[in-house]
Every structure is written in structure tokens, then in C-alpha cells.
Regions:
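Predominant activation on well-ordered alpha-helical scaffold segments within soluble catalytic domains
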Residues: 49, 138-145, 174, 240-248
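Flexible glycine-/small-residue-enriched beta->alpha junction loops
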Residues: 113-114, 207-219
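Acidic/His- and Gly-rich active-site-bordering loop/insert found
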Residues: 1-130, 149-154
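Generic secondary-structure signature for well-ordered alpha-helical cores
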Residues: 27, 53, 149-152, 181-182, ...
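Acidic-enriched catalytic cores of C-N bond-cleaving enzymes acting on peptides and small amides
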Residues: 183, 199, 208, 215, ...
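Short small-residue beta-strand/loop micro-motif enriched in glycine and branched aliphatics
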Residues: 125-127, 224-230
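Acidic/histidine-rich catalytic neighborhood of metal-dependent amide-processing enzymes
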Residues: 124-125, 129-209
Length: 294
């Protein structure tokens, strides 16, 4: 469904206001991985909650409790749940995003102050969180603002889940999702994660699938004391070489997973999906550029 022309005109006319709002968001150093900045993460939660209410979203800030970091017991920043629309004839879409950021300083190689939104000569805006993930979150806010100001009905019901710990392991999120599965998340038909990347800097991209993560822990035991390799080498098993042998059986030199049955669990790309790939604005040069290749 294409965007209404009047919406696009409104976006153009509201450009300065959007940039000012993003500039304010970027100026809040909501660094979740540094205890000293925990109050600023909560400040970001409070500000975003207020902005959502202004455009008609019913919100709830959720106390996620405390956690221990660097030997300190700290309060987790409040997550924000939001809802707008409850039409049983419409689909319900859950929007996820986060308002915390990674640390940033000029000494890290930034050409400008990271927490000051800066306009480059080519028109691009640079600032910590401008793309990951405050910019995308504020994009939703802009859409809601237009619908609110023009009283244009939304085509779907929306639910929101915005957190302030994504850059630090999303502590508290699992418990929140479980506790609200029949509450704020009840009746959700699909989900949009507003925290992803374009394939390049030229063409907007919609990501419709993500790889999952599986973590395993293995302990390899060896001799009960430090042994001299000149005496015990090749006589007693060395834990390091045993571990190397084990890990070498998981993948081959091309990165193919060697665990039996794993590939059988992956759905094959259909004709329609392959046709989408063939039309993507994506090339080997894009891969090399993103990886820092020469």
C-alpha cells in the first residue's frame, strides 16, 4: 500500500521538526552499558513515553527490577509498552525498538561530537543512536503524529515494546514478554523489529527474517597439574588440542555447519523468494565494502 501523497507532503513540510526531535533524542547519552549513565537511560524512557502519549498512544512504563553490573546493583530502565487501536477487523502489529545506545567518544574515531546531531556536507545526519535505534523509533512516532493530527484511521492496530537494555543483553525483556503474553501482547498477529540494516546505503530494505542464536558451553578437563611438554607431550592429552579437534568438527573451512541434520531443518528458498533475491540492489562490491575489503 503506497503512502498517501498528502502524507509525503506533510513529511517534507515537517522535516525541520523531525530533525529537531531526533537531535534532542541523540543528545541524551542513554548508554546502558555504563552504570554512570543509567539515569540518562531512564531519562530517555521518560521522554519517549511522553512523546508517545502526545500522539494518542496508550502507554505503560514497566519497572523491570534491578540487576548487578560491575559490582553495583542498578535499577533496570523502564521498558515502554504502548497500544493504539483495538479494531477486531484489523490485524495487530507489534513494533519493537530500543532507546539505549553504545558508548561513543571523539577518541573512538568520531569526526564530530557523537551526542550532538551533526549534518554532513552531503546532507547526512550523524549522531550516536541516529540509526541504531532512536531514528527508527522516532520514524514510528512521525507516522503516528500524522494520523493523530489528521484523524486518519490506522490500517492496523499497533502495539509497541521499546526497551532500554538492548545494547546490554536485553536484561528483563524475556520476563516482560512472558508476563504480558496474554496482556499487552495478546492478539498480536505479526511483529516488526525496527532495529535492522539496509543492504547498502542506496536503497531502503525490508528485512523479513533473522538468524537465531544458540549458545553452548563446553568444559574440557585435563591433568590435575601443570605438566612439562618435553616429558609428557603426546603422552597425556592436552585440553587445548582436544578442544581444537572438537571445534573443527562443527564447521568446515567454508563455514558450512557439519552438525548432522542442521541443514535439513532449513527451509529451502522457493521460486518467489529467489525471484526477490535476483532483483535486490546488492552486489559483491557491497559485501566487500561493508566488510572493509580492498
Amino acid at each position: 500500500m503506497p503512502a498517501p501523497p498528502e502524507f509525503l507532503s506533510w513529511v517534507d513540510a515537517s522535516k525541520d521538526a523531525f530533525i529537531a526531535r531526533l537531535s534532542h533524542a541523540v543528545s541524551i547519552p542513554s548508554i546502558s552499558g555504563d552504570p554512570a549513565y543509567r539515569p540518562r537511560v531512564q531519562e530517555m524512557s521518560d521522554w519517549l513515553n511522553s512523546e508517545l502519549k502526545k500522539v494518542g498512544v496508550e502507554t505503560k512504563q514497566v519497572d523491570l527490577g534491578n540487576h548487578v553490573m560491575d559490582g553495583q546493583t542498578l535499577p533496570l530502565p523502564n521498558a515502554i509498552l504502548g497500544k493504539i487501536g483495538n479494531d477486531k477487523n484489523k490485524k495487530t502489529v507489534l513494533i519493537y525498538g530500543h532507546f539505549d545506545v553504545q558508548p561513543a567518544a571523539l577518541s573512538d574515531g568520531w569526526a564530530s561530537e557523537p551526542f550532538v546531531l551533526t549534518t554532513l556536507p552531503d546532507g547526512r545526519l550523524v549522531g550516536r543512536g541516529s540509526s541504531d535505534d532512536k531514528g527508527p523509533v522516532l520514524g514510528w512516532l512521525a507516522v503516528l503524529q500524522w494520523h493523530h493530527e489528521t484523524q486518519t484511521p490506522l490500517p492496523v492496530n499497533l502495539r509497541f515494546c521499546f526497551e532500554g537494555m538492548e545494547e546490554n543483553g536485553s536484561e528483563g525483556l524475556d520476563e516482560l514478554v512472558e508476563s504480558e503474553r496474554e496482556g499487552w501482547f495478546g492478539g498480536v498477529d505479526c511483529m516488526c523489529i525496527s532495529d535492522n540494516y539496509w543492504l547498502n546505503t542506496r536503497t531502503p530494505a525490508l528485512t523479513y527474517g533473522l538468524r537465531g542464536l544458540v549458545y553452548f558451553k563446553i568444559n574440557v578437563s585435563g591433568p590435575g597439574r601443570d605438566l612439562h611438554s618435553g616429558v609428557f607431550g603426546r603422552t597425556v592429552h592436552e585440553p587445548m588440542t582436544d578442544l581444537i579437534s572438537l571445534l573443527s568438527r562443527l564447521v568446515d573451512a567454508q563455514g558450512r555447519i557439519l552438525v548432522p541434520g542442521v541443514d535439513d531443518m532449513v527451509s529451502a528458498a522457493g521460486v518467489e523468494e529467489r525471484s526477490i533475491y535476483e532483483k535486490l540492489d546488492y552486489s559483491i562490491a557491497d559485501v566487500e565494502g561493508a566488510a572493509g575489503g580492498q
